[in-house]
Amino acid sequence: MLCEEAPPVGSIAGKTWTVNGKLFSRSYRMIGDHFAKIVNQYGDRPAVICKQQNDRATYSSLDARSNALARGLESVGVQTGDRVGVMLGNSMEHAVATYALFKLGAILVPLNPSFNATQVVSALAHLEASHLIISTESNLPRKDPRSNIPLLQHLIPDLSKTRIDSELVPSLKNIISVDNSSGRVNTSDFNCLTAYKSLTSDATPDKSALPPRNLSPTDIVNIQFTSGTTAMPKAACLSHRSILNNGSQIGDRMRLTPEDVVCCPPPLFHCFGSVLGYMATATHGAAIAFPTEAFNAKAALRTVQEEKCTALYGVPTMFIEELSLLDEGVIPNEGFQYLRTGIAAGSSIPAELMKRLHKVLNLTELTICYGMTETSPVSAMTTTDDPIDKRINTVGRLLPHVEAKVVSLDDHNNILPINTRGELAVSGYLLMKEYWNDPVKTAEVMIPDSDGKVWMHTGDEASMSPDGYITITGRVKDLIIRGGENIHPLEIENCLLTYPGVIDASAVGVPDERYGEAVAVFIIHREPESEAADEDKIRQWVREKLSNHLVPKYVFFLQPSESFPKTASGKVQKFKLREDAVKMLKEKNNFG
């Protein structure tokens, strides 16, 4: 038996909510072991499709390619437990490197391709990384490709040397370069770089398994840097057990099968792409299709059409951009009949957007995921057959073998009753092991209760219904406290999204002499110069639909081409909007 079955029925135990279900049995608790079984079962099935590269791999081919790369990496010194930075877009090289490192027992450290030199150095030095796999160019959404040579020269001033010599990252032994520049970047004089192609050859498939490693299911296999909605990213350490089971359970909720093809625009350097995407498909023998290295709405829709995709992933801003292309006739509204499911995550999905995705893209079984990097990442999720109101107003119920409680913001030991708002805390197999080499930050969020059970305190305000559905009402730090009353930005934002012409909206609190904080809203409107985009009309709209204390004092309009500052997972970085609001108000001399 692959899985140990238990009734997938929730039950309230005291004041916490627990769910039983299945976890992978002892034989398949390491990712490499489980992948070998999938290859044996579904070897001829498509595993990875990279449209931009015109490259695709079956499970057998992915196994052979990752074996070859693993041996190549081993030949340049990669060992079990080494931290290996991978700074690549959604590409075949990234997909192959993922399993090569898992098989070696090395630790995959995905790095955002948009990182600048300072960020890369900080990440590699913090983890004492031994190797870096990096593309010659970084492809970023809505931008021209960026050469990574200046970044490498910052890391290693003299790239012509045959040996790596980096004062900034002394632990660094080797840099493997992936040439994705189509001839725009010449690395022939950089002797300290090892070409990715020199480590593996597609012409000689390596079907022989690697020698067994002495690995444990609780070994760290992946270190993910948190998105950073409020502060500098932290390095969350995830295990074989946590991401293997999380990916499997996500796929179960979507009812994935080997016949499914998942279009995955979200990035592999983030848990959305790597666990919700790649691990979910790989645990079910399904295929994952990457349209481009970085998000491109046209390419995503064309991939769905050409590959007859059955699932589409995205954050709300991605879906909005895709629907706009269809509205404008840039992409013909056809070829989406095979779509049925997918995942919307990163931020709450407005009701109108959900309805349009059902109607226009046939995503009638679209699911909603909730989680955080530190929980591998998903702790709650809707099912494909949950009523639409549950998929709009909640983030679903807990995944199997996850426990949750809602606690007082003032006292973490005070578990609040059902239907009461407080901070959500979760426990179970999915918790990270720690923030790498940061016991202080780890202790701030991973807090044991009186029985010694460790809980991850999410920083999200939530409530839980009697039947286990969780509603996220916002970040605790994003609550606007006006005159001692808590205001939830999401309530205002959902109201604004129903105003004609509004594409996106975000509410933040700004300092106010009388009330402590006042409500400020940022609005992206289709016609920002029109009569409809009027501050007083916006205030009147909110006043008519909500109570007076929720009416924004300040209204800021952005152009349709602009976007809010967001993390890699699509979460709005409200602290940056708050800073912008304060700056603009000071310039207008509206307050001190």
Task: Walk through the language-model features, giving the residues of each.
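Conserved AMP-binding/adenylate-forming core of the ANL superfamily
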Residues: S27, D44-Y99, N116-V121, N191-T200, ...
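Conserved ATP-binding/catalytic segment of the ANL
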Residues: D55, V76, M87, N414, ...
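Conserved structural elements of the adenylate-forming
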Residues: D63-A68, D202-S208, P217-N222, A236-T257, ...
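Gly/Ser/Thr-rich phosphate-binding loop
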Residues: N191-T200, C309-G314, L323-K390, E403
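Conserved C-terminal "lid"/linker of ANL adenylate-forming enzymes
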Residues: I480, S506-D512, A520-I524, I538-G592
